């Protein structure tokens, strides 16, 4: 997922996952390699767009805590020392499908053309920094954790927000699933043995969509959450297809740990009872925005001069109408690592002390 280059950045999901996972998983994984979009980007978009102003809203917690950083691939000094803890290939705005194909389909994505295929090329380019022969690489990757996504959300976002119908966007699902499956298979063939693969989030609860489709029929909304049912049903369909593909890959590679991360149901649990967890800021309004029913305005997005941020972001689920707040990311991270939102349960690996 992605938004304006001018937005403030938040503590993203990957950083929180690493903060909580590494102290428990350091005995199992020597490195983390991450692919995806803005839910995992730790700097690649900023590096690839040096003339754009991107503000960082939170301090460098990982450095302060002494935790290994999963550094962005596009850092200029590529060496094994700089990438000791792994590499992050994720780029905000990235898609699963190739940018050229999406342009041919009439979808415009001005943020980045760094699709999953390009991120995979980066991975293969840097792999020799860690190992130099196939047997070496297989051994190295078997001790690494691969985070595959979330990726694919922007393929749907760009199409839906560009005016395509849900029926047209649904035709993208098998293509996105195929691209993710091909990448997973390629990583396994190179030696990967543990992969965490998230599904998509409930986009029907995001202020950007609630604003875009504001005025929809009352029956289109879930009365208990205020979310758009038809958009969330689409995400449910996509996530089901993704899990079917993961099951197919598991049957081909029974020795590999492929963990599905259920972002959708973890977030829906939060949306159904926000006050119970301290989110009293008026769900599903955004904390930072330019006004309107859901505090999202495409002409005054978070970070633009006309927008302003709330004083209590810890009480909001949505940060900028597109992404979640640090508090929400922390909640979902804990839910994934300590709850029932991964299949198989992530604690069934060596993370025994969670």
Residue ranges and their predicted role:
Residues 2-354:
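Conserved active-site regions of diverse hydrolases
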């Amino acid at each position: 997922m992605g938004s304006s280059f001018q937005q403030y950045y938040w503590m993203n999901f990957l950083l929180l996952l690493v903060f909580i996972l590494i102290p428990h998983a350091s005995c199992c994984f020597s490195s983390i390699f991450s692919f995806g979009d803005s839910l995992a980007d730790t700097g690649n978009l900023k590096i690839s767009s040096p003339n754009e102003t991107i503000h960082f809203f939170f301090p460098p917690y990982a450095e302060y805590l002494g935790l290994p950083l999963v550094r962005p691939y596009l850092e200029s000094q590529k060496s094994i020392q700089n990438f000791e803890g792994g590499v992050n290939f994720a780029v905000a705005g990235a898609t699963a499908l190739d940018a050229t194909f999406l342009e041919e389909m009439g979808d415009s994505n001005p943020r980045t053309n760094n699709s999953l295929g390009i991120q995979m090329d980066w991975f293969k380019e840097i792999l020799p920094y860690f190992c130099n022969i196939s047997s070496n690489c297989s051994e190295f990757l078997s001790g690494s954790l691969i985070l595959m996504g979330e990726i694919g959300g922007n393929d749907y976002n760009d199409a839906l927000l560009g005016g395509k119908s849900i029926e047209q966007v649904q035709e993208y699902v098998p293509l996105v699933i195929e691209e993710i499956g091909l990448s997973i298979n390629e990583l396994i063939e190179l030696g990967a043995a543990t992969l965490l693969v998230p599904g998509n989030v409930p986009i029907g609860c995001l202020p950007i969509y609630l604003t875009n489709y504001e005025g929809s029929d009352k029956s289109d909304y879930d009365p208990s959450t205020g979310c758009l049912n038809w958009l969330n049903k689409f995400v449910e369909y996509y996530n089901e297809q993704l899990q079917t593909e993961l099951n197919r890959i598991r049957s081909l590679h029974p020795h590999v740990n492929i963990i599905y991360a259920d972002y959708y149901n973890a977030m829906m649990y939060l949306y159904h009872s926000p006050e119970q967890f301290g989110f009293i800021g008026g769900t599903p309004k955004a904390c930072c925005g330019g006004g309107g029913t859901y505090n999202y305005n495409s002409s005054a997005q978070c970070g633009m001069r006309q927008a302003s941020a709330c004083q209590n972001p810890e009480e909001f689920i949505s940060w900028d109408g597109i992404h979640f707040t640090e508090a929400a990311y922390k909640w979902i991270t804990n839910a994934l690592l300590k709850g029932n939102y991964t299949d198989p349960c992530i604690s069934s690996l060596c993370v025994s002390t969670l």
